[in-house]
Amino acid sequence: MKGNKGIRIAILIVIYLLWLGCTYYVLLPALNPHSIGFWLYLALVVLLPPALVSLFHTSDVKVTKKGVKMVKAVANTPAKILFGAIGACIIIILIGDIAGAKLFHAKGYASILKTEDYEFSEDINQQTALSMIALMDTNSAIRLGNREIGSLSDLVSQYDVSDDYSQIDRNGAPQKVSALRYAGFFKWWGNRDKGVPGYVAVDPVEQNADYVKLEKGMRYVPSAYFNTDLERNIRFHYPTAIFGNTHFEVDEEGNPYYVASVYTYKIGLFGGDTVKGAIICDPTNGDCDYYDVAEIPAWVDDVFDGELLTKQYNWTGELGNGFWNSLFGKKGCKKCTETYNSEDENYVADYGYVAKDGDIWIYTGITSVNDDASNIGFILVNQRTSEAHYYSIAGADENSAMSAAEGEVQEKGYQASFPSLINVYDKPTYVMVLKDASGIVKLYAMVNVEQYNIVTTASNLDDCFSKYKKLVKAGGDEDAVDDGDTNDDGDETKLKDPVDLEVTIASIEYVAIGGDTYVYLEAEDGTILRQKFADNESLISLRIGDKIKVNAQQSETGTYYINTISK
């Protein structure tokens, strides 16, 4: 019996070790006391199974001819110790949660995101062109990306595009990027050696998407399995790191990486979460590197995600004058603008993106906690460094601006997307897209923050911008707006007198605007010229390096509208 008992114990130990290995492999908990998941893993996975085994192993028995006979009860000390340890884990979670409560640390929460006051007109450059404005929402990017991949027959059967698009600033221009993903387990199994072949890059200004094929496939991705699963690969490299916000980015040369934010907790065990650094993983070989916030490469754009930053500002706005004031007096309490989330059926903090100084910044309006449909200011926060700027500007909140834009074309039933914020003649201005029921962008709209009765809409962004500037100059009086010259494209852009130019073509772009195709030519000296393709189909014969003579008229945005062109 003693020999059999030893074998049983050995078998139980092997089973227990296999249990620990398998559960860790699947659950991937951070081995960090600041993680609630660590304490739950310790209690329910590590301690509970041996505690249950010890609980049922309470007696010594003896086998006789008459059967099994209980000899004596065994004092169940191991079970008591193990259940006591489980209770201690639960107590640590409860005490840690209470110790980090806002009731005791209101000032600590309020000081996590440090904001500085800035003048809007001095900090945000006046907008002279709209090439740096990212107006596209994720749903529109998904639609364009799926359309691009759907046209590639060799890919569509094995891969699809991840819905997790990242907003980045690449070489000074906004861009949305998303990696392809395996279309299921068997597609991964069949392609696991060569990996995911590329990613989709979406231009939110031109509203188009391109598939980028990589020289070396990405093997360590979220849609992979077993050891090439991205999260598992990062966890095995950094077993104690509490990481999240894992997303896809590309550097300035277009090389792919996955970036994961690494969190720390400044208040108690589990309170005051913020980012202390980032893990950057090369998905082609699985190599991972950790960087503190101050050392993160400049090409990385999303380290502090928008949800975290808006939550941290709400701590600042609501708890700055103490916890009890946030509940009762609410003196000086403010919060980020909220929009209605139909999926969760509640209001959540929302934000837009602004490309500034080579980084992506989130912006959102700041309103009082009384929900009065007006803003008292704005914040702009750098997603890489968490540098936060506050602008004290009273005006309409984003929801009111969206309603004003929708009201301009209410008979069409278009819906406005969450706006971006720009500076026009030192006036803060909302700019947004209006989409139909299918999610297709139909119009662009601009709304003055301080006077949201100043609204313009147009089928393309340049025309909307031109009309808005005229309306602002006229003080919002549409009757006082001088329509000016009408160019040969039929829009209302005011043009200067015709001039003759001789230039050498440096680049050629075909852009779809309002259902028409326009040809944009960039000269070697930086001059931008455009003409509607339907008006001059000979434009298709132009090549980079051609020297051309044009008669053109310059618009207020600096673009030259071509009247005649010859080589």
Q: Which positions does each model-derived feature cover?
A:
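Soluble extracytoplasmic regions of secretory-pathway and membrane proteins
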Residues: 4-567
